[in-house]
Every structure is written in structure tokens, then in C-alpha cells.
């Protein structure tokens, strides 16, 4: 039976990793996979994470199962950074740990389908795996143009989709640092998006993959919070890959905002059932390290400093790259 399988094309984005490693040129630059690198090409472990891992070595006394919801302490520790310090949401918010942001997006789409969503709208271009996940889960994919030719977000295209969507539709939006265009919605545009979603009843799925690496921790989720303040229900996928440097440890979180607190038990039980069937429980180590950082004031301060250093360095590198492009004929 297995000999009947057709070969699949390799993931174009991941293939760039191998191509970059095999390229002998010393002046090569990897602009493919979203991994932070220093000037010498290294992807270092955060100092705060190293210290947290050592604390875990010294204090962790069990490797027993936690269940499909994962480390709830990790999930709760992230909440103030994503939703705000006073974001109780009237008991309408619940979350669970996932294997990376990809696991969170997959769970969001699968849960949406279980709830009756038949079509998910996705801006183009987008992170390639978004479309693959939608196809694999088995929902219809609708599209709209994300970036206009002038380099700004095509807000009218999104608003038109929301206005004409069916009651059983959802829309998947990048919370910040749009991948791959880098074109984000302005605060005023987020206001319009939030109002449109509230009026339409379309379910928002918000993917937050680069929190803290755009303008700042608060600024990067301002749009997400605007939406959540207006809509009755939403799903949020969150990744710790970039802002904690935990790429291969697969650390993510999935949050469900229900219409009422009474709806949460059924929603979370369905999410847990889907997680159980897909990965049983998420890997613990990375989430435990993040929880340890966020529960220790000194480690949190170190992490915030490291994140700010990364953000500022990337800003400088982008400016230098843009300036260099201006000097190359044919690129403007």
C-alpha cells in the first residue's frame, strides 16, 4: 500500500535552510525562515531561558504527564502580556498549551470546523503553512489581498470580505509583524476591523507569532485587544518561538474567548479532545522554562532587556539593508 503514495514537494521555506547551509559563499544572507541570527550567524539561547532551565534542573521533581491542556501555569503566565493585566473577560477566556504556534493554529482551525465553520478567509500572501493547514483540516479557503502595491495594507479588501462573508465563515489575521510582507494594519485600521467583525459575526482567528519583535510588547497586541474588546468570541494562536528563542522546543498557546462563561466548558472539552487525538499532550520543557521566566521578576527583566535588544538590532539591520538596496540598480 505504501508504494502507492505520490512524492510530495518539499516545503519551499524549509528547503531554504538546507540551501543556505550548502551555499559556500561567505557573504550569503538567509532571508528565508523566521529565525533570529547574530552578526556571526548564530541563534543563541536567551540568557533568561538558560537561567530558567538551570532552575528546572535543580527543582523539577517529575516528568509525569500533564494532560492535553499542558502546563496551565505557562498558559496563565502569558495572559497579561497578550490580553492585558486586567483582561479577565468576565470568565470568558480559557487557554491551553500547544506544540508551537503551528499547533495552536491547527487547533484553532480544527475547533472552528467542529463548531460549524466551513470557510476561513486568509490574506495573500501569508505564511505558507496557513494555507496547508486549512486544506489539511478540510475547510474551504477564501482569500483577500493583504498588501496593496504601494506597500500599505489593503484594508478595503479585508473589510469587503468581512461584510460579504457567511455566518459560518472565519477570518485568519496576523496579530503583528505580518509574515511575509511586514505590512501591518494601523491602529485606526484595527478599529475598523474590530467594528466590522463585531457587526458581521465572522469568527476571528488571530495568529500572534512575533510578539514583542515589532514595535513593542504592548504595541504589537494593541490590534488584537481592539478586536477582542468588540467581538463576542474569538480564537488566538500564540507562539513563543521567536520572542523566547525556543524554536525547536515547540512552545505555543491557544486561547478561546467564548460568548459567555457558560459556553467555555463545552468549548475547552472539544479543544482538549482534538489535542488528545493529535498530540496527546504538548512537550513540557519549553513551556516550563517560559513559566519560570515569567514568574521570576529578575528573569522577566532579563528577558525584556534581551527582547528589546533583538528588536532594536533588527530595526537597525533593516534600515541598513534598505539603504543598501537603494544603491543597487534595478531594485527600485
What are these model-predicted stretches?
Residues 1-4:
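Generic N-terminal amphipathic, Lys/Arg-enriched alpha-helix
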Residues 9-100:
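N-terminal small-domain helix-loop-helix segment of the aminotransferase-like
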Residues 29, 121, 142-144, 205, ...:
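Hydrophobic/aromatic beta-strand patches that form the interior of the parallel beta-sheet core
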Residues 37-41, 180-181, 213, 245-246:
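Short catalytic/ligand-binding loop motif for oxyanion handling, primarily in non-cytosolic enzymes
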Residues 60-197, 212-213, 222:
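Conserved core of the PLP fold type I
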Residues 185, 189-241, 245:
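Acidic, glycine-rich loop-and-beta core segments that form the ion-binding/anion-interacting portion
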Residues 229-304:
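Conserved core segment of the aminotransferase class I/II
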Residues 302-332:
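Conserved PLP-binding catalytic core of the aspartate aminotransferase-like
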